[in-house]
Amino acid sequence: MNSFPWLTIIVVFPILTGSLIFLLPHRGNKVMKWYTLCICILELLLTTYTFCYHFQLDDPLTQLTENYKWIHFFDFYWRLGIDGLSIGPILLTGFITTLATLAAWPVTRDAQLFHFLMLAMYSGQIGSFSSRDLLLFFLMWEFELIPVYLLLSMWGGKKRLYSATKFILYTAGGSIFLLIGVLGIGLYGSNEPTLNFETLANQSYPVALEVIFYVGFLIAFAVKLPIIPLHTWLPDTHGEAHYSTCMLLAGILLKMGAYGLVRINMELLPHAHCLFSPGLIIVGAIQIIYAASTSPGQLNLKKRIAYSSISHMGFIIIGIGSLSDTGLNGAILQIISHGFIGAALFFLAGTSYDRIRLLYLDEMGGMAIPLPKLFTMLSILSMSSLALPGLSGFVAELLVFFGIITSQKYLLMPKILIAFLMAIGMILTPIYSLSMLRQMFYGYKLFNVPNYYFFDSGPRELFVSISLLLPIIGIGIYPDFVLSLSVEKVEAIISHFFFFDSFQEKRINGKRILLV
């Protein structure tokens, strides 16, 4: 166990210092904004320092572990730890939250509560990614939903309460299945609850029971990822939420579902994952094509970007189902890559709305001349969304593509068919991306009238846009920087499935053998 509680400090620091924001002057909006921004920067620096000096990349085991007895009544521990799978999402969370705080600068109504909720969400997300106890993971998962619901219901468009209610109904429904899975796994085969991830990774279950647990977790994570048909909350939520909240949703919240699939479904329930992985690949391929073909029909700019996010999540699903180290590395890289791309697109959509007060594409046009900086940034980021070579999306999707082609788990013809469907989705992506640019920036609309003048992107908006663009370019040029974080852990996860294939005939009373 680690001698110094680095992770506890990282988890608690945002919400603890954020609660002090209510002691600041009520009318001091600038003071609150700078205070929140400083907290996010300090948290990001602390996280970076901890990982740089206390984390070993070549070790696939859990590091910086902390284990404190919390509730003695049912043996509940405060267990934290990180490995190659969680370090990337944690750093992504810090980076996106810091920029989202800067993006929320124009928010003035109930600014104290708004910034506190962002910091509370920050703590919940880092807690979910660093939890090594199943019940603690569930508590952090649920805790994070409270600030998200309040951010959605109090700031945004006219239908924000409807979208927030839809979001909480979907996620609360998924949380019921998550709780059932947590209690089922924790209470199975023992008089006392077993909730430690390391212990549960060595636990064996009857096949039917493992499948039931897997389905429960899959439904919970499918809502958050989202996986069709449990995706309908996402376009409505993005369409009404404030764009800084959209940055957090697209950049971090969706990735929690993918993280849960790998952390729990793949690691703790490998036999059931072998059974369900072909279905995941089929659903992922369908999702890529469905969302990419639905996106061009969306006139609301933010809903169109939301459907593009759903399409890109299909690549993550296929990578997780590929059961290959190349495919899983591609899925993890897509988690990081789309975190930057999705956050950047929603930020630019929000800044354009701040200027023209329009969200529907059929009302726009001719914005390239009055808003050249916005036009340039959105054009570059749209290219990254359609996986232009040299940008992060290209490397991630290429790895997933090769991962499914080179997977040893599937026959040749199904792999060719899935690759063909993925290629169709890649072809459809430029259709909605380029048509969005054409409708916004080209043509002859109201913005070409001489009497109309709009302020282009200012220093704050350019800083946020460039800060999101640089990692996209950096990962596209040198993807090993991100892949090196998770490659050892991915090999350890995938090796379990090959080990299982070698000894799967050795079963006793319907239970699988020990996989690790």
From Swiss-Prot:
Signal peptide segment: none
Main EC class the enzyme belongs to: translocase
Record-linked InterPro entries: NADH_Q_OxRdtase_chain4, NADH_Q_OxRdtase_chainM/4, NADH_UbQ_OxRdtase, ND/Mrp_TM
Protein localization: Plastid, Chloroplast thylakoid membrane
Family the UniProt entry places it in: Belongs to the complex I subunit 4 family.
Molecular function terms from GO: NADH dehydrogenase (ubiquinone) activity; ubiquinone binding
Keyword Transmembrane: yes
GO BP annotations, alphabetical order: ATP synthesis coupled electron transport; electron transport coupled proton transport
Enzyme Commission number, as recorded: 7.1.1.-
Membrane topology note: Multi-pass membrane protein
Keywords, ordered alphabetically: Chloroplast, Membrane, NAD, NADP, Plastid, Plastoquinone, Quinone, Thylakoid, Translocase, Transmembrane, Transmembrane helix
Catalytic reaction(s) noted: a plastoquinone + NADH + (n+1) H(+)(in) = a plastoquinol + NAD(+) + n H(+)(out); a plastoquinone + NADPH + (n+1) H(+)(in) = a plastoquinol + NADP(+) + n H(+)(out)
Matches recorded under Pfam families: Proton_antipo_M
Protein's UniProt name: NAD(P)H-quinone oxidoreductase chain 4, chloroplastic
Entry keyword annotation includes Ligase: no
Any one Gene Ontology cellular component term annotated for this protein: chloroplast thylakoid membrane
